[in-house]
Amino acid sequence: MSELNNEVRFGKLAADMGFITMDQMLKAIEVQVKENIAFGTHRKIGMILLEEGHMTMDQINEVLKVLEERRSL
């Protein structure tokens, strides 16, 4: 699965879990794409949301745990 699909899945799940809004997810993806184009860097959506104060590290880890559990099914 592509990296972008993984990022969208993370963001959608975080929104579904009530940690962020869909608007915050879309803005984080926009930041990610702009940085990738401008600087050739790729920051994870979770790190962008953390740095912008929209998620805590505990929330990020909770989302990642659920994603991992779903992958193992």
Positions of predicted regions on the chain:
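Non-catalytic accessory regions
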Residues: 1-73
